[in-house]
Amino acid sequence: MKYVVLLGDGMADWPMEALGGRTPLQVARKPNMDSIARIGRCGLARTVPEGMTPGSDVANLSIMGYDPRRYYTGRAPLEAAAMRIPLGEKEVAFRCNFVTVMDGIMDDYSAGHITSEEGAEIAESLKKVIPGGRIYPGVSYRNIVVLKVCRDAVCTPPHDIMGKPISDHLPRGDDAHILIDIMERARPLLEEHPVNRRRVSMGLKPANMIWLWGQGPAPSMPRFHEIYGLKGAVISAVDLLKGLGVCAGWRVIDVPGATGTIDTNYAGKVRAALEALGSVDLVYLHIEAPDEAAHSGDVEQKIRAIELFDERVVGPMIHGLERSGEAWRVLLLPDHPTPIEIRTHSTDPVPFAIAGSGVCVDSVDAFDEISASEGGYGMIEGNDLIRLLIAG
């Protein structure tokens, strides 16, 4: 038996007046996802335990079969694992976003999706403002900073405060002044940086501030195969997902042209997933684009991202599995909702569908938040999804 998790990040949403009281999933043309719902069994999953922040880190850890209340230590250490960054016993990893702040307002959590090359050039120049720490450039606006302090500071994700004053959301608590000092000392350097001068001259958003958040020590997790007896692989453009794969003992597959945006290499991801199933039992295929569109507040882009996920990932993946001649099961879902209305994540349960060999079919005939609520699985905890997928 081969298993595939098809995950559209942030696809779930709330009913919108602009869409006639429907959600983007209900409006989007998605024949392949609807087909999985028809030939499979649906339900709703609480991927974010009560009291935890609805980040992609918590939600995906849960979907992978780990209880976040037991194993979660922070987002940044997972991304550090993906980047093979060593963390000492007393070291703490922080996510360091390049952001755009205008008149004290968080204008863009990604600095206009600055390129990785530009980000690396800026990161190199920031080493002087992080005494006793280290900075590692990642993909686009994402970087990792390693410090030996501030483990218990309260930090806010920048995508949660789009359009809001940053002064209300600066780090708080023990040693938070150290983080604020680093962020403030970087600002004059960033304002004068050649990369930002070029970006402004081209009408692009500058990376005029850094934002530290998501901190934690290195996680300690049992390997996936030790729990479930299966070998796994993960395919994603996002370091967070790769880091989860590293911590789970999965094979991490890099696909050229995988961008984490709507123009990603969909065909390359599907091809890599089908090839990987020749040597592993389960592939976790993650697409970031719907979430990025939702954070930007662009409902049409989110609908388009959902449709591309359906057309270029879900359809070809099912076709490839059917041609393989092997028994298979698929789990289809988002990790969390990212409602356009609030432009950040929510804790609402997400729709899911499991289809394939030996799955008992229910009466649901469409894949969306409302239809899945009538599914045969009912409401379950997110960390039980993998067990359901294996059990059928």
UniProtKB/Swiss-Prot annotation:
Gene3D superfamilies xrefs: Alkaline Phosphatase, subunit A
SUPFAM superfamilies tied to this protein: Alkaline phosphatase-like
E.C. designation(s): 5.4.2.12
Keywords assigned by UniProt, alphabetized: Glycolysis, Isomerase
Organismal lineage: Archaea, Methanobacteriati, Methanobacteriota, Stenosarchaea group, Methanomicrobia
Disulfide bond entries: none
Class of the enzyme per the UniProt entry, highest EC level: isomerase
The protein's name in its UniProt record: 2,3-bisphosphoglycerate-independent phosphoglycerate mutase
A GO term for molecular function: phosphoglycerate mutase activity
Record field: catalytic activity: (2R)-2-phosphoglycerate = (2R)-3-phosphoglycerate
Family in the record: Belongs to the BPG-independent phosphoglycerate mutase family. A-PGAM subfamily.
Pathway recorded for this protein: Carbohydrate degradation; glycolysis; pyruvate from D-glyceraldehyde 3-phosphate: step 3/5
InterPro entries in the cross-refs: Alkaline_phosphatase_core_sf (IPR017850), ApgAM_prokaryotes (IPR023665), Metalloenzyme (IPR006124), Pglycerate_mutase_ApgM (IPR004456)
Superkingdom of this protein's organism: Archaea
GO biological process: glycolytic process
Function: Catalyzes the interconversion of 2-phosphoglycerate and 3-phosphoglycerate.
